[in-house]
From Swiss-Prot:
SUPFAM superfamilies in the cross-refs: P-loop containing nucleoside triphosphate hydrolases, TrpR-like
Matching InterPro entries: AAA+_ATPase (IPR003593), Chromosome_initiator_DnaA (IPR001957), Chromosome_initiator_DnaA-like (IPR020591), Chromosome_initiator_DnaA_CS (IPR018312), DnaA_C (IPR013159), DnaA_dom (IPR013317), DnaA_N_dom (IPR024633), DnaA_N_sf (IPR038454)
Function: Plays an essential role in the initiation and regulation of chromosomal replication. ATP-DnaA binds to the origin of replication (oriC) to initiate formation of the DNA replication initiation complex once per cell cycle. Binds the DnaA box (a 9 base pair repeat at the origin) and separates the double-stranded (ds)DNA. Forms a right-handed helical filament on oriC DNA; dsDNA binds to the exterior of the filament while single-stranded (ss)DNA is stabiized in the filament's interior.
Residues binding ATP: G145, G147, K148, T149
Subcellular location, principal: cytoplasm
Region feature (Domain IV, binds dsDNA): 318-438
Subunit structure: Oligomerizes as a right-handed, spiral filament on DNA at oriC.
Domain notes: Domain I is involved in oligomerization and binding regulators, domain II is flexibile and of varying length in different bacteria, domain III forms the AAA+ region, while domain IV binds dsDNA.
Entry keyword Nucleotide-binding: yes
Any Gene Ontology CC annotation: cytoplasm
Name of the featured protein: Chromosomal replication initiator protein DnaA
Pfam family, one: Bac_DnaA_C
Originating gene: dnaA
Family indicated by similarity: Belongs to the DnaA family.
Amino acid sequence: MNEINKIWQKILEIILEKVGESTFELWFSPIKLLDIKNSEAFIEVPNRFFKDWIEDNFPSIISDSFYQITGSQVEVKYIITGKEHETGLIEEKKQVIKKGNLNPKYTFDTFVVGPSNQFAHAASFRVAENPGFAYNPLFIYGGVGLGKTHLITAIGNYILDKKPEMNVCYISSEQFTGEFVSAIRHEKMPEFRNKYRTVDVFLVDDIQFIAGKDSTQEEFFHTFNELYSKQKQIVISSDRPPMEISDITDRLRSRFGMGLIADIQPPEIETRLAILYKKADMEGVKLPEDVAYFIASRVKSNVRELEGSLIKLCAYTSLTKVPISMDVAKYVLRDLLPDENKPITIELIQKAVCEAVGLKIQDIKSKKRTKEISNARKLAMYITKKLTNLSLAEIGNAFGGKDHATVIYACKQVEKEKEKDESISRLIDSIIKKVTGQ
């Protein structure tokens, strides 16, 4: 195995850990690293739908993983299999992204407005028209894949379009933390502070990830104050409102609520249909009405999954040269779309938990008491109690003959862990959504 392949295998391992097995197998397993030249990584994708989906859903995951493995920043450039001559066009598009580190696809024009996101959209547009004066800070919160990143990026793109001289910075809180730690390690704090305290617009995605990181919170607090005092626009996104973010300081939580707080809810069916038609139009695909309704009626809570279902369907029909139809949609999306009539059983919950943590069902049914197995067993018991009407004795019996007291203890332990560790809450939420088909 040559050096490039070794690097790529390590990167794939990181991506697998971040996105989960099903997403990895579908979207990342088929792509490969062709070459690395002059800080540019050339990635081969089967067709443009893969490129579009990765850029829309995980725009920085490959470059971030490169940095984690090699310590070097790279610019990712996509090459479509068999179409090397299109590389220049793709590279040209990628150059636009460099400005403010913004994805040019995320604009107000491409954002579908509905009752579930109307307020957040209106607030974002107002901020974009009058940065630093309308609502400062603007705090947008909502579940995973509902359009928070799209909106805060649209703010940046709009401002740069109208006022290209402005210094717009988009960054995730994880990236902010990583650069902060690196600056301390390499004694480059003055450069770090100059980079983030001199911007005109500060767009921060997924702020909840600084929870529990005291030094990062301290640095972010002073960065926030410096920008706010100069009337520079601050926009923050999170998966929950400020008051529900645990393990952050009260003074930081207070800063988050100083301006306007806007939420995004899961889209209703009309908005989901509009999103599908908009995405299909952007991809140059004719989407039959029955297929659109089929997808929209099944994928209910997540715009990212909604668009992902369409992109998977488009990728399949593009590769196989067959037209989009209801039969094709049902076949291609059979694993992604839930069966609404499927009852929630303890076996279904055990399977979902084990898939999420990488164990076998027989492990959590066994007498084994390793920490990994014990934690998974407690999670499964907790979710079973939450989603079913089974008695405590019935739940215990399904986990290797445990008694009702063990189930009660397990549920209490999970509740405590949820309060201390937000990653546990996110894991439980994702498992519940998978089991319930949301």
